[in-house]
């Protein structure tokens, strides 16, 4: 019981420290569905470990209805997890989440097999997963990993890496000195934008080259029916 109370206090304090929108403790207690989902899960997980599987599932089912967050009672969750906004989050049975992680709305930690074995992701400590991202399979995301919004991750990610895109690609690796919980989506590298920028630059260079060739060979252009402006 003392351990439960300690975790409850930590959960509340975590939100106070990491969400600038949290005005006071009463608001946190009453208005944070992600917090409620974690509390329901702690109870359901304890019952699940004691073999009360159906009761645990009923609590999990009620929690999903009440909070919009679905956490299987078999999932193992570390300390100070913050589920921000929460709606649509799904955490599968064999998922494991380390300490001090941050999960935004719409995140799915899903499985890729019907076999009754480890089939869901394992998250290290201080992992951040952006909204509407999907992490599939029995893969491991190392400590300090950041997953950009809307990404689909199906391969293991080394500690400190940043992953974006579909499928997820590693675009940056942080050193331990630079590792932080800040997650400015606008500052994340975007490989698709970089690719488009490169294509546009190449197109511009080709246009300039064609114009130079046209100016050097006006007679050839007229023979081909090309008009020079």
Question: Which sequence ranges carry the predicted segments?
Answer:
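Terminal amphipathic alpha-helical/low-complexity segments used for targeting or macromolecular assembly
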Residues: 1-63, 178-229
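A structural signal for small-residue-enriched, beta-sheet-centric alpha/beta enzyme cores
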Residues: 169-181
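Proline-rich intrinsically disordered, low-complexity coils
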Residues: 20, 73, 121, 156-159, ...
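Solvent-exposed, flexible loop/coil residues
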Residues: 34, 39-42, 75, 81, ...
């Amino acid at each position: 019981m003392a351990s439960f109370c300690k975790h409850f206090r930590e959960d509340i304090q975590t939100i106070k420290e990491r969400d600038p929108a949290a005005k006071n403790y009463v608001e946190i207690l009453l208005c944070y569905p992600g917090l409620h989902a974690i509390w329901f899960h702690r109870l359901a997980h304890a019952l699940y470990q004691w073999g009360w599987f159906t009761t645990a599932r009923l609590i999990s089912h009620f929690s999903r209805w009440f909070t919009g967050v679905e956490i299987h009672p078999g999932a193992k969750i570390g300390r100070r997890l913050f589920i921000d906004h929460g709606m649509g989050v799904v955490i599968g049975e064999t998922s494991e989440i380390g300490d001090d992680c941050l999960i935004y709305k719409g995140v799915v930690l899903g499985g890729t097999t019907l076999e009754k074995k480890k089939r869901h992701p394992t998250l290290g400590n201080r992992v951040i997963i952006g909204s509407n991202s999907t992490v599939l399979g029995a893969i491991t995301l190392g400590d300090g990993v950041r997953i950009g919004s809307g990404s689909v991750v199906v391969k293991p990610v080394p500690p400190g890496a940043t992953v974006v895109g579909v499928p997820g690609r590693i675009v940056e690796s942080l050193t331990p000195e630079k590792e932080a919980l800040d997650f400015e989506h606008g500052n994340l590298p975007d490989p698709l934008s970089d690719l488009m920028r490169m294509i546009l630059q190449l197109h511009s260079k080709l246009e300039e080259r064609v114009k130079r060739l046209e100016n050097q060979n006006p007679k050839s252009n007229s023979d081909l029916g090309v008009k020079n402006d």
